Structures are given as C-alpha cells and as structure tokens.
C-alpha cells in the first residue's frame, strides 16, 4: 500500500530516517511548520503536524490528520477535513513536561531564584 505522508513537525535527521524506515512503502515529505506549501498539503494522504487550516481544507482525499497539539478544534469544523478522515492529537503528550515546568517555575518564584540569578549576572558584567 503506497501512501503519501506530509510531516510538518520539527524532526532531526535521525527521526526522519526512523520514520521513513518504519514504513518504506510510504513516500514522505518533510516541511518546517513555517514553510508548508499548498502543493505539499494537496499531495498528501496523511498529514502529521499542524499545517494551516486554509491549506488542509482544500485536500479532499486526506485520510489521516495528526494534530501536534492537544486541541485540534480548528480542524474539526465542518468542511475542513473529509468525513472519513481519521483525526488524532497529542492529548496528554505534554502533561508531564508542563507539570515539571510549572513546579520549577513555582519553586523559582517562591525562593526568589530569578532575583538571585539577576544579581549574579550583574556582578559578572
């Protein structure tokens, strides 16, 4: 089965190679999110990442859309994706990282760590 996959995610070369090796019968195109082209979106059967809604809505044969965010609401509006298109998202993928960040920020604020850092930086100048 041959599928055309557009990947709009920030992947390094190793991740690209791993993705291509996992399904060698698929054809891949990789674009940075800020460099997505309409012809690539129209070409794709599968889109991984948040290509612009205005481009996605013109692709009437897309079979799978993987949102890179937890809330793909803009893509779920009527007429954006074909009715038979499978939609998946990143719900829960960032939970641990966000929790760790929030805890670190809270501790930093409570202990005035940012004030200490700023004072240390002023002495180094």
Task: Name what the model sees in each region.
Residues 83-125:
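Phosphate-binding beta-alpha-beta segment of Rossmann-like dinucleotide-binding domains, i.e.
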Residues 1-88:
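An N-terminal-biased, well-structured beta-alpha scaffold segment characteristic
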């Amino acid at each position: 089965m041959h599928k055309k996959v557009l990947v709009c995610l920030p992947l390094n070369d190793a991740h690209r190679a791993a993705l291509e090796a996992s399904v060698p019968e698929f054809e891949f195109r990789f674009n940075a999110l800020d460099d997505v082209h309409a012809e690539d979106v129209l070409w794709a059967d599968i889109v991984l990442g948040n290509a612009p809604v205005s481009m996605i809505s013109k692709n009437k044969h897309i079979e799978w859309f993987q949102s890179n965010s937890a809330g793909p609401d803009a893509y779920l509006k009527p007429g954006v994706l074909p009715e038979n298109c499978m939609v998946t998202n990143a719900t829960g993928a960032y939970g641990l990282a966000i929790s760790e960040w929030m805890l670190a920020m809270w501790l930093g604020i409570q202990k005035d760590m940012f004030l200490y850092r700023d004072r240390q930086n002023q002495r180094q100048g």
